[in-house]
Amino acid sequence: MNNETDIRKIKKVGQVWRADEVASLEMDFFSDINVVAGFPIPLSNDERAKKIDVLRMLCPHPDATYLIRVEGDSMIDSNICSGDILVVDKSNRNPSENEVAMCEVNGEYTVKFVRRHDGKSWLVPANKNYPEIEINDGDEFNVWGVVTFVIHQPQSV
């Protein structure tokens, strides 16, 4: 299957962008300053800021990376929420058990952990309200890529 066919199928699920078609974005980055999530610390002036290419940081392989919007809550316990944008690297199609993967099963796409045991593959959600999906011998199954970053807005309290 070629990339254009893949993209057409995925676009039926939601929004998809090729990373190499997204304009570069440079922003100020304070690499020598750590912000604590405890008591406030003084922050120096903007002279310490360095420029960082956000797209290059998120997408080390832009020609093989796609941005895909999530629908659903099967991965909520891994902090992947409906509406988030996933950065998916297609150059890695062999996820570890701790990496979230975008997978194609019988022509449909899903985001799950891929676990292999007893000669079988399972798609494992990060939400106890969803069952694990066993990949059977007759199923068409492919790992489409590994999720490298999740972009989402912080939840308000």
Residue ranges, per PLM feature:
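Hydrophobic beta-strand signal
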Residues: 87-88, 102
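Glycine- and charge-enriched low-complexity intrinsically disordered segments
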Residues: 115-157
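Short, well-ordered loop/turn sites that connect or cap secondary structure elements
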Residues: 80-81, 94-95
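Short, positionally conserved secondary-structure boundary motifs
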Residues: 1-76, 109, 131, 149-157
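Structural motif
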Residues: 83-84, 99
